[in-house]
A protein has these predicted regions:
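Structural alpha-beta junctions
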Residues: 44-55, 132-146
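A structural signal for short, well-ordered beta-strand segments and their strand-loop junctions
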Residues: 113, 144-149
Length: 170
């Protein structure tokens, strides 16, 4: 290996997903307005443990803009935004080859992201944990789910997103 090869290696950009957490983004047609009680109930159902303060490894941290869910060894951040994900939906959807995906993306007005903050968790396991929580909060407002790290979008109008989450849960 020559000097130029070493130099290229030092200054080469990391792959996009090297530092990106595993994430599931629910694209919503209308705001969720999630309450602490709703998030605790969803986490309790997802992980089979009461979120009532009785177990220090299972709790919900609450702030109006950022919520966290501690599920045993896992830490999940839950971020809500009352704006389209990645900017103007029509502009983002222009590159879609599938018309149904394009229409679903354009429909969304707001989003909720579930990010696993534990970087050392294997990808399949990370998505399993996230899918358990996201599946409990999925409802008719959801236009689809997006996995940024995988650049994968699944629509919900035909139940595909729900089925995708179910498969990820294992």
């Amino acid at each position: 290996m020559g000097f130029l090869d070493v130099a290229r290696g030092l200054f080469r950009k990391k792959h996009a997903d090297d530092d990106m957490p595993c994430s599931i983004v629910m694209l919503l047609r209308s705001p969720f307005a999630m309450s602490e009680e709703i998030l605790k109930a969803a986490a309790s159902k997802a992980f089979g443990v009461p979120y009532d303060g009785s177990n220090a490894m299972y709790f919900v941290g609450w702030h109006p803009r950022l919520k966290t869910v501690k599920a045993g060894p896992y830490l999940i951040s839950v971020l809500e935004a009352e704006e389209p994900y990645l900017g103007d939906p029509a502009e983002v959807a222009q590159g879609f080859k599938n018309k149904r995906l394009e229409e679903a993306w354009i429909e969304h007005r707001t989003w909720v992201a579930f990010d696993l903050m534990n970087g050392e968790v294997p990808k399949k396991q990370a998505y399993t944990v996230l899918a358990k929580l996201a599946a409990e909060l999925l409802d008719t407002r959801c236009a689809g789910i997006y996995l940024p790290r995988e650049n994968q979008f699944t629509i919900q109008s035909d139940g595909s997103a729900e089925m995708h989450l179910r498969k990820m849960k294992g």
